[in-house]
Amino acid sequence: MADSSFDIVSKVDRQEVDNALNQAAKELATRFDFRGTDTKIAWKGDEAVELTSSTEERVKAAVDVFKEKLIRRDISLKAFEAGEPQASGKTYKVTGALKQGISSENAKKITKLIRDAGPKNVKTQIQGDEVRVTSKKRDDLQAVIAMLKKADLDVALQFVNYR
């Protein structure tokens, strides 16, 4: 029997993030407590979101609204990293970045976790910004997926190419 495998990746569906951003922008435009604060949310480049408002409290609340919309769209908050509010003139601004890809540090943590706690006949390979897990038994692969979902890692994980 051939080996079964799957890949562990950390990718965010940009269209879902765009939908969450548009929903947050709509809510910020219509909510009573944001009236007159000139609160806005927009893309800044390809992988960053910029929120601006007239007060520090309102910009923090806008970040919370955006995070709420990300959760509703099934996007892990581990994939979004918001910065601190910065004063710029009469407005406050927060820039948040989307984190994609598994860093080499996190890939090493994942492979070590699988080696230490996972089934014994499971092999891992680091391939750029993803990790491939192979085994002869599919049950072992499913056990690895369950273990990684329970593990507290600081990166959002998706499991793709399950064969």
Swiss-Prot record:
Membrane-crossing segments per the record: none
Q: Which UniProt keywords are given for this protein, alphabetically ordered? A: Nucleotide-binding
CC terms in the record's Gene Ontology section: cytosol; plasma membrane
**Matching CDD domains, A to Z?**
YajQ_like
Q: What's a Gene Ontology MF term here?
A: nucleotide binding
Q: What does this protein do?
A: Nucleotide-binding protein.
Protein name per UniProt: Nucleotide-binding protein Rv0566c
The species is Mycobacterium tuberculosis (strain ATCC 25618 / H37Rv)
